[in-house]
């Protein structure tokens, strides 16, 4: 499994609906990049200049909303993930 460093998290993307509310099927070219995901791994936190480590506010299993163009896409063992910093996370769902 991927283990992120510092204040980074690894998320699995949650795909958006392929149909609109009225039943129109959207082609891949019309879909926007997902902005929702589930955290599958979290780093140990960021280190302050004093050397003190600050734990992350999010944890494994959290569903999150993140900035549209944030993170780095990676493919690991056939699954696509996104690695991003905690500061790119906008909200935790639920």
From Swiss-Prot:
UniProt entry keywords in alphabetical sequence: Chaperone, Cytoplasm, Stress response
Description of how the protein assembles with itself and partners: Heptamer of 7 subunits arranged in a ring. Interacts with the chaperonin GroEL.
Induction: By heat shock.
Similarity comment text for this entry: Belongs to the GroES chaperonin family.
A GO term from the CC aspect: cytoplasm
GO BP: any one term: chaperone cofactor-dependent protein refolding
Pfam families, A to Z: Cpn10
Predominant location category: cytoplasm
Superkingdom in the source lineage: Bacteria
InterPro entries named in the record: Chaperonin_GroES, Chaperonin_GroES_sf, Chaprnonin_Cpn10_CS, GroES-like_sf
UniProt function note: Together with the chaperonin GroEL, plays an essential role in assisting protein folding. The GroEL-GroES system forms a nano-cage that allows encapsulation of the non-native substrate proteins and provides a physical environment optimized to promote and accelerate protein folding. GroES binds to the apical surface of the GroEL ring, thereby capping the opening of the GroEL channel.
Molecular function GO terms recorded: ATP binding; metal ion binding; protein folding chaperone; protein-folding chaperone binding; unfolded protein binding
Keyword Signal in annotation: no
UniProt-recorded name of the protein: Co-chaperonin GroES
Subcellular location: Cytoplasm
